[in-house]
Amino acid sequence: MSSNKQPGLPTEVSYNEAVEASKKYFDGDDLAATVWVSKYALKDSYGHIYEKTPRDMHERIAAEIERIEKKYPNPMNRQEVFELLDHFRYIIPQGGPMTGIGNNFQAASLSNCFVIGHKNPADSYGGIFRMDEEQVQLMKRRGGVGHDLSHIRPTGSPVLNSALTSTGIVPFMERYSNSTREVAQDGRRGALMLTLSIKHPDAERFIDAKVDTSKVTGANVSVKIDDEFMRAALAGKKYYQQFPIHSDKPLYQQDIDAKKLWDKIIHNAWKSAEPGVMFWDTIIRESIPDCYADEGFTTVATNPCGEIPLCPYDSCRLLAINLLSYVDKPFTKEASFNFEKFKQHVEKAMRMMDDIIDLELEKVELIINKIAADPEDEDIRRVELELWKKIRTMARKGRRTGLGITAEGDMLAALGLRYGTPEATAFAVKVQKTLALEAYRATVKMAAERGAFEIFDARKEEKNPMIGRIREADPELYAEMVKHGRRNIAMLTIAPTGTTSLMSQTTSGIEPVFRPVYKRRRKINPSDQDAKVAFVDDMGEKFEEYNVYHHNFVKWLEANGYDTSKLQDISDDELNRWVAASPYHGATANDIDWVAKVKMQGEIQKWVDHSISVTVNLPNDVSEALVADVYRTAWECGCKGVTVYRDGCREGVLIDKKKKAAKEENGQTILKRPKSIPADIVRFKNGNENWIAFVGLQDGRPYEIFTGKIEEDAMYIPPKINKGFIIKVREENGSKRYDFQYIDRYGYTNTIGGISRLFNEEFWNYAKLISGVLRHGMPITNVVSLIESLHLNSETINTWKLGVERALKQYISDGTKTKDKCPSCGQETMAYQNGCLTCMSCGYSKCG
């Protein structure tokens, strides 16, 4: 590791320079290089890059971990930490810790996820809107957020205001969803999880909320199901709903046909992949933090991906261990798992996780100080300030961590075990059990050296099932825990590792390999007469196909004497024989038995004190009965949650409702523009300059867009204004102009006349062209693709182009599929989730 770096004086590097250097670091893997530079390289608030390769990032992280380690006995040094991180070989921080540790340019949290809520039920408008503001404040600092809606009174119940009756859950789902869509996090929207108890009288409305794919597009939704409901549904009995859901004297009660509602959950999951299901009694029964409910640790919701159930104002940071790196002599008959090295590294990973909590507390303190010093009125700052103080309190009290794993599929293949078989599942459970015991051993050791989390009480935990399994597996460890306590209230999870696995060049999380071989297409140069045409697209463009291989399938070939120099020209028949001989044969995402996979998840879950985020990917032609079988099996075998995704279930883009057309051109219906249409404001950076986009909407869909540089002396719009109207005005001489109108905080209408005159003519003309395409109804995904394909000479215009793409992507509904091939697995299964193009097959994401 280099020793002459000066952390206080970073040197700026260009994007292309960083990509080229990182491509060499990743042995020519340009996808891994571009993902790392785009998402994880050190950047300032203007997007300037200060790291060339992941080595620089790992040195940055190692230096900060060493600084914290020096506070405690037996510290790890920088070199020791760096070697664990280097080349993503052993220990991989995920998301926030990778981008934020040692980043002094931005006041942002290191936490991946948060949950918010009220200490006491609060279903007033004040309580509902405070939740909305807290959600936005967390998302602006890169946090994913979850919260529960079960405290909101059901539809039709009386309220003591002029409305007389409650609107119920769904309008507030839409409100929280819209807030998520509006908050930019490094070019993408925030991530949100909304949950509701099945016991709530509005549960059916909640379950149906996303059947219309134009609704609640900025949130994942999951229904919290209790054991009583499951027993009633499977037995065909009645189930009682009430509000408040935990009250001994509810204000409202109703009985329902549990089987009918269960069938609706299954149908909607089959049809649109939502809602997800959380088995809430299992979560609470297994939750160690809930042993401290009297201290505020009552679990109420999960983070957006579902792997961390949390209490209000608690947070978590994620880190994954690369299991493949512990296989000695991989892909040979002598292959074995190095449990001794694994145990040592689990202890070090837990120390690093605890150090990251200290680093997070420093970041939170900076955020609190920044808010306190802001010039805005105290009453404006109050909610955000109190929010971060609550987060600081919960982080100090519990010191929660999120240690997980990745490369499960590759580890099993390297050992000669076929994913999904009983032998492979048994070994996977053995590894997870070892991880759990060593993580608990490490946290007990840290409690002795550093002190236990401040509310530890062994008596409160003694009946917890997870603690019981620890006690039974290792009585001596349990005795030490009773004596010294634990450093951390809860520690383990298995989170999605989409982009993480791209950089470690392994399978993701506990998932199998998607395919060991897939095909990519390359456009043929018209002058290349010898190219073999494999595909011609709608525009007449010709493509050739070539094979792309999973990194570790190639390692298996090399370890077993195959001539890998033949790979680019190999015949399909010979390649199929090679695949059939490999441990990946019959063990891909499409090969394994889906119900067996859920059973494997349930067995591993016994040794994970939080939860596991897994989506069961199903082919398009599966029946609803199979989805029901997957969900029922998940409950029976102890899973804490389950989500399914049936291929193509959300295919297509939204079609506006039919409206009276003003005219038709060449068979194309064109909607007449009203004089005034609603508009959203999207602000973005073009280089170092502040730019703005006005997006005019028809039926919630972009109809026109005007963009340019913000000139405050000519066009001042308060930062908190994000909505208004674009008004088309016809002058006496026949010319037209566009005005922007908004309502300020005092309720007065403000109009900015002729916004076109305020923008550079070149940008205005490009925006007019894009608006013309939007008005003719081209799907937003196609418009974004069209803009992405523009090759413009000016760097300023190219930066502007990225801002326009970002603005329009906010209006692409989750689940909207594109014809794009996934750059990781090569499948045409790319769909938009939270504004990010995500592969529904392998988990690759352009954003997250």
Where are these regions (language model features)?
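Acidic/polar, glycine-rich intrinsically disordered N-terminal extensions of enzymes
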Residues: 1-110, 262-271, 632, 636, ...
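Active-site cavity-forming subdomains of large catalytic enzyme subunits
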Residues: 3-5, 15-27, 111-345, 349, ...
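Catalytic alpha/beta core of large soluble enzyme barrels
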Residues: 30, 306-308, 360-362, 467, ...
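Conserved phosphate/anionic-ligand binding catalytic regions in large, soluble enzymes, centered on
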Residues: 100-110, 114-115, 125-148, 183, ...
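Terminal amphipathic helices with adjacent charged low-complexity linkers/tails
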Residues: 225, 286, 291-293, 303, ...
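Short, Gly/Pro- and small/polar-rich lid/capping loops
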Residues: 478-480, 656-697
